[in-house]
A protein has these predicted regions:
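Interfacial helix-cap and linker-helix signal at transmembrane-aqueous boundaries
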Residues: 33-34, 64-65, 152-157, 232, ...
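Cytoplasmic helix-loop-helix junction between adjacent transmembrane helices
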Residues: 101-138, 318
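Structural signature of the two symmetry-related core transmembrane helices
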Residues: 73-87, 272-286
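Helix-to-loop junctions at the C-terminal end of transmembrane segments
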Residues: 57-69, 256-269
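C-terminal membrane-cytosol helix-exit motif in multi-pass small-molecule transporters
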Residues: 167-186, 373-381
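Helix-breaking motifs and short loop linkers at transmembrane-helix boundaries and internal kinks
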Residues: 69, 91-93, 290-292
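Helix-loop boundary and gating motifs at the non-cytosolic
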Residues: 4-51, 207-208, 218-232
């Protein structure tokens, strides 16, 4: 039996491989699907299926894992779903099957909530938040290393090889997941019930920040994980440059995310930081149709990545701040399921607009949604905060 320290290190490795297997092909995936002669509307639906699967499965998977207390099983199933997705994407070229196996990646990502609960069971309650911080850092490391190396592999071999790279990581992760430690027997968790979800859903602040999170994810999955790589390829970006583009879009968010609550929020106020973050993101998207240089596109995406990183952690924190401790896990499940709608709608809407009008129009409308989110945040967050304080 492994000691606890080795168990934790093993879990970190499994987590990194899990996200690596889901992200290795992401930079080239939009252009890969486009190269199959598939319409932009269908490209958007394929890209959005990842978020759609998470939107409908996250809460049921959380409920089932709580009910049967078999969380290690769901970690292993998540790896299998990721491997199945990657192999299917490598083997099949038909649009319907690409859609199916991309949705399988969303099924795999839906298991993430179980990863977090299982990992937290390795620690005393007081140490769990710090441990989760490390786990989220490992998650980011897995994603960023995947997008960077995926671009290199695609440029050196072919787009198809990125699916094999992702599958290899998933297979290694699957076998390692068989060795991770089960949850502590003395730790129990009350299963989430539908009435609990409906109860926390009535919280005004949680509903507001969940709506803003939908818009935040809309922006991210319409652009960075959606059609920005398509715009870059039209400017002559190589596969390596597409990988680099997605990587440098994510890295600044790691820095701004770490500073969002500890520095920016305290110094300038949460509402102001969220408002400015949405405005900066919208501006970076609005510029895309008018850019004729890859260098300028890279710079705008660095700025956009930094601004997105400021927004999301603050929204998450504000959503559960006034929720009672015994309902915070339920509130987080509600929040995560809700923002999956933005992951789905972002690429779908831009794909439809691109077919109907142009890719540039898709970016302009996406930017408009970002500015709308900024106005909504500025006008509504303080009112909702005051209402919560009055009700307390």
């Amino acid at each position: 039996m492994m000691n606890n320290k080795k168990s934790i290190v093993l879990f970190y490795i499994v987590t990194a491989l899990f996200w690596y297997s889901l992200y290795a092909y992401v930079p080239i995936f939009p252009t890969y699907v486009e190269s199959k002669g598939i319409s932009y509307s269908m490209v958007g639906i394929i890209l959005g299926s990842y978020g759609f699967a998470q939107m409908i499965l996250r809460i049921p998977i959380g409920i089932l894992s709580d009910k049967f207390n078999r969380r290690k099983l769901y970690v292993t199933l998540g790896m299998l779903a990721a491997v199945s997705s990657n192999i299917g994407l490598w083997y099949f070229d038909e649009a319907s099957l690409i859609l199916l196996f991309r949705a399988f990646a969303g099924v795999a990502a839906s298991m993430w909530v179980v990863y977090a609960v299982l990992f937290s069971s390795y620690f005393k309650q007081a140490d769990a938040p710090k441990a989760m911080g490390f786990l989220l850092s490992v998650t980011t490391l897995g994603q960023v290393s995947a997008t960077f190396t995926g671009g290199i592999v695609s440029g050196s071999f072919s787009d198809k090889h990125t699916f094999l790279l992702a599958a290899a990581a998933g297979i290694i992760g699957f076998f390692l997941s068989l060795m991770i430690k089960k949850e502590q027997k003395d730790i129990t968790k009350e299963p989430v019930r539908l009435k609990d979800l409906l109860s926390v859903g009535k919280d005004r602040m949680l509903m507001l920040v969940s709506g803003l999170a939908i818009l935040s994810q809309f922006l991210t999955f319409a652009t960075t994980y959606g059609f920005t790589p398509v715009a870059a390829s039209k400017l002559g970006a190589s596969s390596y440059e597409l990988g680099l583009l997605v990587t440098i879009s994510a890295l600044p968010g790691v820095i701004s995310g770490a500073l969002s609550g500890s520095f920016f929020g305290k110094r300038f106020g949460e509402r102001n930081v969220i408002t400015v973050g949405f405005m900066m993101t919208a501006a970076s998207v609005l510029l895309i149709p008018f850019i004729n240089s890859l260098t300028i596109l890279f710079l705008t995406q660095i700025a956009g990545g930094f601004s997105k990183g400021m927004v999301f952690p603050l929204l998450m924190g504000m959503g559960i701040k006034n929720i009672p401790n015994d309902k915070r896990a339920t509130a987080m499940g509600f929040y995560q399921a809700i923002y999956g709608l933005g992951m789905f709608l972002g690429p779908v809407v831009v794909g439809i607009l691109t077919d109907a009008v142009s890719l540039g129009t898709g970016f302009v409308i996406t930017a408009a949604i970002g500015f709308l989110a900024a106005v909504t945040a500025f006008l509504s967050l303080e009112k909702a905060k005051s209402a919560c304080l009055d009700a307390a």
